[in-house]
Curated annotation (Swiss-Prot):
The keyword Transferase does not apply. GO terms for molecular function: ATP binding; proton-transporting ATP synthase activity, rotational mechanism. Produces ATP from ADP in the presence of a proton gradient across the membrane. The gamma chain is believed to be important in regulating ATPase activity and the flow of protons through the CF(0) complex. Keywords: ATP synthesis, CF(1), Hydrogen ion transport, Ion transport, Membrane, Thylakoid, Transport. It comes from Crocosphaera subtropica (strain ATCC 51142 / BH68). Pfam families: ATP-synt. This is ATP synthase gamma chain. HAMAP family: ATP_synth_gamma_bact (MF_00815). It is a peripheral membrane protein. Belongs to the ATPase gamma chain family. It is found in: Cellular thylakoid membrane. Its main location: membrane. GO terms for cellular component: plasma membrane-derived thylakoid membrane; proton-transporting ATP synthase complex.
Length: 314
């Protein structure tokens, strides 16, 4: 016969665990909203910057501009930036982005191209360190909601690696936020920039909304139209110098947005994982309660039978 006290203790333990997972779900949901607000707040600057770059490149003719960040080189070494989380309890978030990085590394090896890693997040750092991969830099302990200063620090090092020709291309592997239950690891080239890299048409931003008491994601398609500069506009500085100053800002902004999307993906994955854990805990509590009631009923029945048997013996 099952031990009633053991079942009762286990029920209480699962209830306590459910309280923790539910609290973690609510915290993650609140932080997803903050990540969303940050993405939206940085959008006007990104739009204005893209518009200026678009017009400058059109005015100067892209192919005629000789700037380091626009120069295509023979690719011998690729710098791969892998963005992961610092903690677990977020489903397959970390394993998916690491798997995508491994896949990209395999592709480069098959092409005879070397690679150098820049890891962001403790999980990616630990994974590749254990495998003695060539890690150029490691970044851990960043804010859960990435800041512009953090992105600028990382972007400066990436630009240094590219401009010093330590690497011939910089690729960013991060998790793009799709929905609360879906995310997708993607590969984006940060440097060198191409004309396609400045296109923002049909870009999307996400909004976390509450509908009928449930959290949902609403994606908004950005249909930005680039406004052209007047043909007789006179630049106080050389347009090439302006472009040279703005390109690092653009890369910095792209990195910041990728970090924000990755953070939102991690928080959404954690929220989903904790929601599933809470649901599973509720089901387990129901199963244990049923087992407890059956065991208690069996114990009472056994006691009654013993009393009746004793009375008959008299």
């Amino acid at each position: 016969m099952p031990n009633l006290k053991a079942i009762r203790d286990r029920i209480q333990s699962v209830k306590n665990t459910k309280k923790i997972t539910e609290a973690m779900r609510l915290v993650a949901a609140a932080k997803v909203r903050r990540a969303q607000e940050q993405v939206i707040s940085t959008r006007p600057f990104a739009d204005a910057l893209a518009n200026v770059l678009f017009n400058l490149l059109n005015r100067l003719k892209f192919g005629d501009v000789s700037l380091p960040l626009l120069q295509q080189r023979d690719v011998k070494t690729v710098g791969i930036v892998v963005v992961s989380g610092d903690r677990g309890l977020c489903g397959g978030y970390n394993s998916y982005v690491i798997r995508r990085a491994e896949q990209r590394i395999k592709e480069l090896k098959e092409q005879g191209v070397n690679y150098r890693l820049v890891t962001i997040g403790r999980k990616a750092t630990q994974y590749f360190s254990r495998r003695e991969a060539p890690i150029e830099s490691k970044y851990t302990g960043l804010n859960q909601i990435p800041t512009a200063d953090e992105a600028a620090t990382i972007a400066d090092e990436l630009l240094s690696l590219f401009l010093s020709e330590t690497v011939d291309r910089v690729e960013l592997i991060y998790t793009r936020f799709v929905s609360l239950i879906s995310s997708r690891p993607v590969v984006q080239t940060l440097a060198p920039l191409t004309m396609q890299g400045l296109e923002t048409e049909d870009d999307e931003i996400f909004r976390l909304i509450t509908r009928e008491g449930k959290l949902q994601v609403e994606r908004e398609t950005v249909t930005q139209t680039m406004s052209s500069f007047p043909q007789d506009m006179i630049f106080e500085q050389d347009p090439v110098q302006i472009l040279d100053a703005l390109l690092p800002l653009y890369i910095n902004n792209q990195l910041l947005r990728a970090l924000q999307e990755a953070a939102a993906s991690e928080l959404a994955a954690r929220m989903t994982a904790m929601s599933n854990a809470s649901d599973n805990a509720g089901q387990l509590i129901g199963t244990l309660t049923l087992s407890y009631n059956k065991a208690r009923q069996a114990a009472i029945t056994q006691q009654l039978m013993e009393v009746v048997a004793g009375a008959n013996a008299l």
